[in-house]
């Protein structure tokens, strides 16, 4: 397919767009409602087409042999609409407010055998189209396919040449729009000879009806005329599963672990006379040995610059994820489009770069780091470089296949400008504040110059086992909800239960913190003081489980296929797992650090 011209440049709207997003979290045009008078023209924009089971594989509507104006005029698009693959253009449909149309001819066409074959292929791949009326998306299938698996075998393909538009209004505003092909017979595309032309007449009708619903948000969410699945119901199974796991883990940490610690502290804090009389310097081998390593537990780890960068970027994504969910709870995103979420995510990522710079530089200076500039460069590159490499591959595949998901050059330059003028400077500014406000690392115990030898560890205290346990338990807390999230991002579901999403997100962080504390305690009890990186890897491995789940979802829970969709799915699924590794690794590390400070502060040292 040939790529059509890109929509008019919207660079002049960039800074107003950012300001609107900053103040309201909304995209211009997504929630705006136009007021009409009877007889006013209502513009219908054609947008995109693509396989129903491949949501990210979309093409311009006019890349199909359909009714098309002589000169294609594109609608100016917002950032989120461009990122969502929208390429809206004016159409030949003539619709006027509150004026019904019984049956009007749109155009007459003579299709060659090659054009008919193009339509047949699109219909066999279940192509759907998307139009936009007053910022309301309306969708339908391009054609009809009937296939029987019994003898005699039949394979019939037909094209919908008549569309029935149904629009609901309240006063002077359009509340709902839908398209259907009920009581319409498809035009057969079978039996055409290679040198033969097919004559088609495209028609349409328009029906207006008044509704008592005053606002679009009051209309039943997810009601898309049955084209896409309805909004998901409350996921009680996910909530119960997560709550049970949280109660078990919190109970384990708060009751069992604290009871063990109380016994340890009571034994270790014997006064010197009792300890010396009972040979207190020789600990029983059955006792936990975390007290023995008090002179090594705060020994700074290797690759401290990389560790601080992980913590900084992880803290940034924790803030970004929380911000997105809070904005969704406040009703700042339209249920019909994901474009507003894309725009908000880009804006929040740029603004929260100061968090990554501050956290990374602050902790780096605390643990004695001296290469501050290198730490900032590593922090700002830790996510942006993998993201850029992944996006380059995905965008190249889209571009090679003529997909509208391929970003225009102007959009790429603008996004790069935002990162260079907003994201990177804020990282540096945050790093400066973090470095200047950092105080020396406050360790409850002094660290000896010579490191203590670590005794051999049993297999169940290995890094691999800790990563398996620490990754699987947080993953199991969100596994049910994760299906619905995948079905929304990579499928046709419409997710609006943001309250439950916030609840599950909080559960995920809580489970990660509890697991981290428990695993760190067991590691220290084995006289292994190398907890710094272990705490990050143990719970951060949840990202690996999420990626493995994405492989399972692709193979067993979806009907996605083709190079375009497959490359995008696995590319961004890998990035998603990486982001969860950064977030949960950060939560895990600071939870373990807080726990270790607590137990050693309460331990009386000689």
Swiss-Prot record:
Full protein name: Transmembrane 9 superfamily member 1
Function of the protein: Plays an essential role in autophagy.
Cellular component terms (Gene Ontology): autophagosome membrane; cytoplasmic vesicle; lysosomal membrane; membrane
Subcellular location: Lysosome membrane; Cytoplasmic vesicle, Autophagosome membrane
Organism from which the protein derives: Bos taurus
Keyword Nucleotide-binding attached: no
Residues carrying covalently attached carbohydrate according to the record: 178, 401, 559
Pfam families (alphabetical): EMP70 (PF02990)
Signal peptide: 1-27
Sorted UniProt keywords: Autophagy, Cytoplasmic vesicle, Glycoprotein, Lysosome, Membrane, Signal, Transmembrane, Transmembrane helix
């Amino acid at each position: 397919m040939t790529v059509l011209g890109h929509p008019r440049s919207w660079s002049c709207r960039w800074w107003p767009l950012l300001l609107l997003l900053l103040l309201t979290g909304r995209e211009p045009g997504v929630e705006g409602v136009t007021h009409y008078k009877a007889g006013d023209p209502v513009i219908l924009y054609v947008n995109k087409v693509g396989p129903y089971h491949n949501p990210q594989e979309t093409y311009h509507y006019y890349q199909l042999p359909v009714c098309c104006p002589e000169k294609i005029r594109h609608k100016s698009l917002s950032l989120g609409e461009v990122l969502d693959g929208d390429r809206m253009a004016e159409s030949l449909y003539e619709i006027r407010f509150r004026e019904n149309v019984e049956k009007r001819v749109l155009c007459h066409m003579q299709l060659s055998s090659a054009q008919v074959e193009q339509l047949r292929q699109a219909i066999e791949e279940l192509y759907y189209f998307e139009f936009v009326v007053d910022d309301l998306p309306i969708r339908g299938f391009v054609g009809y396919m009937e296939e029987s698996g019994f003898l005699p075998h039949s394979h019939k393909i037909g094209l919908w040449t008549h569309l029935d538009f149904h629009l609901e209004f309240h006063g002077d505003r359009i509340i709902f729009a839908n398209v259907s092909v009920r009581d319409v017979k498809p035009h057969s595309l079978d039996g055409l000879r290679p040198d033969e032309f097919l004559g088609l007449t495209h028609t349409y009708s328009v029906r207006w009806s008044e509704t008592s619903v005053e606002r679009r948000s009051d209309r039943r969410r997810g009601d898309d005329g049955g084209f896409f699945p309805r909004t998901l119901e409350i996921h009680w199974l996910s909530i119960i599963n997560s709550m049970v796991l949280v109660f078990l883990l919190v109970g384990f940490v708060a009751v069992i672990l604290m009871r063990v610690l109380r016994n340890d502290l009571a034994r270790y804090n014997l006064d010197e006379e009792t300890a010396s009389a009972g040979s207190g310097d020789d600990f029983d081998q059955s006792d936990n040995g975390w007290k023995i390593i008090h002179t090594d537990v705060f020994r700074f780890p290797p690759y401290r610059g990389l560790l601080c960068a992980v913590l900084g970027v992880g803290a940034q994504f924790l803030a970004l994820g929380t911000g997105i969910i809070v904005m969704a709870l406040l009703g700042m995103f339209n249920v019909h489009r994901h474009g507003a979420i894309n725009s908000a995510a880009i804006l929040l990522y740029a603004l929260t770069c100061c968090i990554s710079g501050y956290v990374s530089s602050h902790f780096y200076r605390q643990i004695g780091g001296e290469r501050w500039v290198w730490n900032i460069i590593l922090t700002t590159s830790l996510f942006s470089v993998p993201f850029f490499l992944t996006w380059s591959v995905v965008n190249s595949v889209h571009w090679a296949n003529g997909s509208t998901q391929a970003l225009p050059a102007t959009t790429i330059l603008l996004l790069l400008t935002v990162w260079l003028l907003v994201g990177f400077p804020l990282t540096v500014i945050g790093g400066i504040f973090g470095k200047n406000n950092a105080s020396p690392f406050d360790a409850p115990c002094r660290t000896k110059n010579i490191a203590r030898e670590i005794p051999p560890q049993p297999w169940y205290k290995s890094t691999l086992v800790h990563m398996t346990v620490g990754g699987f338990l947080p993953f199991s807390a969100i596994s049910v909800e994760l299906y619905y999230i995948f079905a929304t991002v990579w499928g046709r579901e419409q997710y609006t239960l943001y309250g439950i999403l916030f609840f599950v997100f909080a559960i995920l962080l809580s489970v990660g913190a509890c697991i981290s504390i428990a695993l760190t305690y067991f590691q220290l009890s084995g006289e292994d003081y190398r907890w710094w990186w272990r705490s990050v890897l143990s719970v951060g491995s949840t990202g690996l489980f999420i990626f493995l789940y994405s492989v399972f979802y692709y193979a067993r829970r979806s009907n996605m296929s083709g190079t375009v969709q497959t490359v995008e799915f696995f590319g961004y699924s890998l990035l998603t797992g990486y982001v969860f590794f950064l977030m949960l690794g950060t939560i895990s590390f600071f939870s373990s650090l807080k726990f270790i400070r607590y137990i050693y502060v309460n331990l009386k040292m000689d």
